[in-house]
Design a protein with these regions (language model features):
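Bacterial N-terminal signal peptides
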Residues: 5-17
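N-terminal secretory signal peptides that target proteins for export/translocation
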Residues: 1-2
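Signal peptide processing junction and immediate N-terminal pro/mature segment
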Residues: 17-23
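Primary mode marks residue(s) on the alpha4-beta5-alpha5 output face of response regulator receiver
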Residues: 23-213
Length: 213
């Protein structure tokens, strides 16, 4: 009887492990057509998803920070620290409501910019800020604000794996004249947030739908 009970417990544990492993594969697999990223995942899933945004030599020692449940907060905001890091980089899982994975890993200057924007403050960029999005992202277009319902967005622009560079305020004129077309796959300039005049230089390293790793 004892052996049978142990066997059942081991079997149950194995099934649970397989279920978790199967779920974790969805952290980086392409989203099924017609679905959107959500906040409702396990911490392990979010960590795996977030760390996929940057090269291993950066992500393996990065801090991972979750978003606050948008259904509760009513807006995008930083939440719990899921894992503490040591190298000054911070990785975040998917932003909910996007038609493809879009985790990001940012260095300290870029995180200062992001925190200012989320907090409703005008960023004062004093250093070059850098971030990785190696799973790519989907954007609503130049100057478009976040949609309340992603199903109502008429056209998404899919950007392949890329890095983003934010320049100090006194140097942003260096981005003048650079491509602003999101469709041609070339590096382009955009605003990090349509309400804040902080231009960034987005540099794709793969085509949309392609992966680095």
């Amino acid at each position: 009887m004892l052996l049978r009970t142990c066997a059942v417990l081991l079997c149950t544990a194995s099934i649970a492990e397989l279920t978790l492993a199967e779920e974790l594969t969805t952290a980086t697999d392409p989203l099924p057509q017609g679905t959107f990223t959500t906040w409702d995942h396990s911490d392990q899933w979010k960590i795996k998803n977030a760390l996929a945004a940057a090269p291993d030599f950066i992500s393996e020692h990065a801090t991972v920070v979750d978003w606050v449940d948008p259904g509760i907060a009513g807006k995008l905001d930083m939440g719990r620290v899921l894992r503490k890091g040591t190298n000054g980089w911070t990785c975040m899982p998917d932003i909910p409501g996007r038609p493809q994975h879009d985790p990001m890993c940012a260095d300290e200057p870029m995180m200062e910019i992001l925190m200012d924007i989320i907090g409703g403050r005008t960023p004062t960029v004093k250093k070059v800020g850098l971030s990785y999005m190696l799973l790519g992202e989907a954007r609503q277009g130049q100057g478009a604000g976040p949609a309340k319902d992603p199903r109502e967005v008429k056209e998404w622009f899919y950007i392949g794996p890329h890095i983003m560079v934010a320049l100090p305020a006194e140097s942003v004129s260096a981005l003048d004249g650079i491509n602003q077309d999101l469709k041609n796959g070339l590096p382009y300039t955009s605003l990090l947030n349509p309400k804040v005049n902080v231009p960034i230089w987005v540099i794709p390293v793969k085509r949309s739908g392609e992966r680095i790793h």
